[in-house]
Amino acid sequence: MSAIPLLLCDGHNLLFRACFGTPAQIFSRDKEDKRDLTTEFMFFALLRKGINEELPSWPEVVVVFDGEDGSAQRKQTDAGYKANRPAGGEALKPIRALPAVKAGLDLFGVSWVEVSDAEADDVIATLAASCPERDVLILSMDQDYYQLLRDPGLGHGSVQVLNTARRAGSRVIGPAEVRARHGVSPAAFADYRALSGDASDNIPGVHGIGAKTAAALLDGGLTLESLPASGRLTGRKGDAITSAWQQVLSWRDMIRMNHQVPVPAGALVGRATAPLPGAAEVIEKLGLWNRARPADAVWYLNAAGR
């Protein structure tokens, strides 16, 4: 298998950042009825910039999108999962850019994967696990990926997170930073979040248990299973955890990523992806700068042919 580094991009995470994390909007060049191209432009700009700045050479790049029914299984377990996220209006704006983004990836030879009944993080966990000998970088702002991190060792490569929203020099996150900042190892990160909560996924955690308390309870390599016999579940906080025990285990199951998603054959090819051109050129090749008949737009033809 290839020793070429593998970059796995959380497509929806980058898509929403491209849409809502940019102070200035980018519009088409139409004289009238200008169209907002911020999401499409910034998606490619952020993808290219992060890789160019943080990696010595272009890796194999695979962009992974959430499936349409990706969160269904977790929502069956807990109806509150991600229930705090807006579902309409402005929240749909990034999704409307998906056809053009996918077409741009196709046009410039960047692989993308979407499994209809899986979330992107589970697909990324599966792809990372499928090539343990390779160095893997996960492009995302989502801290849930911290559970996948590992240092390089005999027979296996590293897994790190690349968060390009952070300042230069601190964008690549490995196990040492997770231990320093959160007080737990990557292997215990799902246990830690089950106790302390994860607001982004609407997982409340145990009432009265914050990040520091959760880390202290798990100190020394403990897991949830080892807590009842540890002598640490004392006082009001211990009672709160004991009372919510089954719910805590359920939350951890939701936070844990699935490493066995059936991904499409050939999702990884083992060779470097050709470098992306600048975002302006991508938008130009997609025929989006100036209004055109749909049949004249490269991205429309590519999307319709799928």
Positions of predicted regions on the chain:
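Noncatalytic, basic helical substrate-engagement surface that gates or grips nucleic-acid strands
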Residues: S2-L139, Q147-N163, R167-A168, L249-P262, ...
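Alpha-helical elements of the RecA-like P-loop NTPase motor core of helicases
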Residues: D122, Y146-Q147, A215, E225
